[in-house]
Amino acid sequence: MAGSVADSDAVVKLDDGHLNNSLSSPVQADVYFPRLIVPFCGHIKGGMRPGKKVLVMGIVDLNPESFAISLTCGDSEDPPADVAIELKAVFTDRQLLRNSCISGERGEEQSAIPYFPFIPDQPFRVEILCEHPRFRVFVDGHQLFDFYHRIQTLSAIDTIKINGDLQITKLG
């Protein structure tokens, strides 16, 4: 898995299996940057900790049904890795669902949001900020909700998985 995902002008690289990025210049929707393959699975170097932020920028597909962004404890499929937080955008219901899955048991799903922030064929920016008691989730710079930690060992949350009806343009 070592090597560069894209050429030297790329923003995101996978080196030695670790997700790294360059935040030296602002990203605009009309600037070219390589598409990352969906479904995507990447390692979060050092795992999560208070103050650490995960950034996902992308473009929603033209006719989307749903997409999901998950932070997990590893990438195991059998047994499945614990899911610290899964964000699932469901376009038919205009919902942004949140949940966790620990030892195969799904937690209580949360769905309340002030508005549905995603628009088909439009870019978006999701930031997941890890704080001591919770994740704070922002979309396009606006805080949408808090999700209180259900996994207490934050450093074990070391993988990001993205799938569904979107194109990823930047990860950080």
Swiss-Prot record:
Residues 39-168 form the Galectin domain. Keywords: Acetylation, Lectin, Phosphoprotein. One of its GO terms (molecular function) is carbohydrate binding. The modification N-acetylalanine is found at A2. The modification Phosphoserine is found at S22, S25. Monomer. Does not bind lactose, and may not bind carbohydrates. This is Galectin-related protein. The lineage of its organism: Eukaryota, Metazoa, Chordata, Craniata, Vertebrata. The gene is LGALSL.
